[in-house]
Amino acid sequence: MTGSKLDIEYYQQTSPWTLNGEKIPVVDENEHLGLVVSGLQEEERNIDANIASCRKSLFALLGPCYSFKCLLTPTVQTHLWCTYNLPVLCSGLASLPIRPAIMSPIVVFHHKILRSFLKLSSSSPIPALYFLLGQLPIEAKLHLDFLSLFFTIWNNQHTTIHKVVMYILQMSDNSSITWAAHLRTLCLKYRLPDPLKLLKNEQAWSKQRWSELTKTMITVYHEPEQRLKARRNSKMDYLNVQLQGLSGKPHPALLNVSNTQDIPKLRQHLKMLTGDYLTAERLALDTGSNPKCKLCLAPTENIDHILTKCRATADIKQRMLPELLNSVAIAQPDCIILNLPTQAQYLTQFILDCTSPNLPGNCRIAAHNPLVGTIFHVSRHWCFAASQSRGRLLKQLNKLKH
């Protein structure tokens, strides 16, 4: 038997239940239909149990697919995650009123998973995770499942649960912590029709109509919110997400990865694109150290310096620039990046994301251009070569010092 704290104390001490002369044990929690039933912190305990189950499914079923050395693309890993593991993480939570105050553990776990796909550090910007993979936050996924469960109740108008939900919606106010009151809060948040009116006055819609409406309204809510966070994040100067969405389509930088040799190059490209690459300038902001370049003694070492201006790695630019311009000339011959004056101003941004709204319209490559993948292929190779050359020279410099 389970219950609230008062119930537990009452039945343990004052009036215990008995069966055949023996006391019925009173426990803090129990399992029923895959959920942890508890009078104390029920939502938190179910979230912790689901995280543990999801972690087991990650390593037991597809462990090699998610390892750091795995050479699957982030898009393939994300597809496997959404198909096999995300349902385990969200299983049963639609029947509980999961509020923002208790959602932190599952949100942190979700961020950790997405970062592992993109091979980004724990300090990488969160909006970049969502927009690169085209994925909604875990909060939105839980709310979609929650509203899908409401549709099931709405569609079965002769059941007891339909009457119970309607009664609670009629009697409860905004301070209620019931499932039905949480449903009303979500409908207000996402500008969905009032659930009480739907239960009272309307026949259930088709499943497709309700699913499309909820998915659209939830996406419309979260996209501007994440774009605002991206604009305020100093690390995302090169990753402009104003034209990116959270409807499942990945960023063009993740597409057209044709072989396993591109995967290590993609990792360096994404770290530079998201501002997660550790430069002397970034280190100076965090620790107060000297931001100058250790290789060429320039006053500031940042992403722009590493890719296009460092004299110590100038051979990388000399080798990669003609290859990049040849790819651009084939994909979009009128692109102004082919002009020398424009290169100095926009070259770094073009290398990291040639489809970015940061670039002028006549310098930007359309994301739907069938040859944009060839440009990103050169960009990945450029970022990887610059990073490898820089790392090798820094190691040689450290050996000379010692």
Give residue ranges: language-model regions:
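Short, conserved micro-motifs composed of acidic
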Residues: M1-D28, A49
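Structural motif
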Residues: K23-V27, F68-Y84, S123-S124, L132, ...
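Short, conserved catalytic/metal-binding micro-motifs enriched in Asp/Glu and His
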Residues: N30-L40, C54, L80, Y84-I98, ...
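Short, solvent-exposed helix-loop connector elements
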Residues: S38-N46, A60-H79, S91-S104, P127
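Short helix-capping/linker segments at secondary-structure and domain boundaries
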Residues: Q41-E44, V88-I102, D276-A280, H381-S387, ...
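Family-specific functional microsites
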Residues: P64, F68, M236-H402
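Short coil/turn segments at secondary-structure boundaries
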Residues: S67, G92-P97, S123-F131, L142-D145, ...
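Acidic catalytic cores of enzymes that act on phosphate-bearing nucleotides/polynucleotides
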Residues: P105, F109-H110, R115-K271
